[in-house]
């Protein structure tokens, strides 16, 4: 997917706008990352199921929602990628808070940098 070209079509930096633009494009059958509207809801359910002092809580999610937080991607390994208006979060499937990777980039800019190998993640696959 050409994220740089996609960026030119986005009217704003909202994660929901980004997700809708991605979903309007053809998806690869064997992609390492799955974009979906349902992933956010699944993420919240997993937060409830795995609730502990060390994991992401519903309260954390509610706080992030104030900044338009939305989970937009799940990897083949079950890890998540989410964004707010100004940050991108790479969240392990374990949901451990201490393992979350935070990047001060909007989702589209994160994907451009990731595709160009300008970002290193211990959680995500090395290549899209």
Where are these regions (language model features)?
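A surface-exposed partner-binding patch
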Residues: 1-80, 124-127
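Compact, glycine/acidic-enriched structural inserts
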Residues: 93-125
């Amino acid at each position: 997917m050409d994220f740089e070209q996609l960026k030119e079509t986005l009217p704003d930096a909202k994660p929901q706008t980004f997700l809708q633009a991605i979903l309007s494009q053809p998806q690869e059958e064997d992609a390492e990352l799955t974009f979906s509207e349902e992933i956010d809801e699944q993420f919240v359910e997993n937060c409830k199921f795995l609730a502990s002092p060390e994991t992401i809580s519903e309260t954390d999610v509610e706080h992030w929602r104030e900044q338009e937080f939305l989970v937009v991607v799940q990897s083949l390994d079950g890890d998540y990628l989410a964004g707010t208006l100004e940050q991108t979060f790479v969240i392990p499937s374990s949901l451990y808070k201490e393992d979350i990777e935070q990047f001060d980039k909007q989702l589209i800019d994160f994907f451009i940098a990731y595709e160009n190998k300008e970002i290193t993640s211990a959680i995500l696959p090395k290549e899209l």
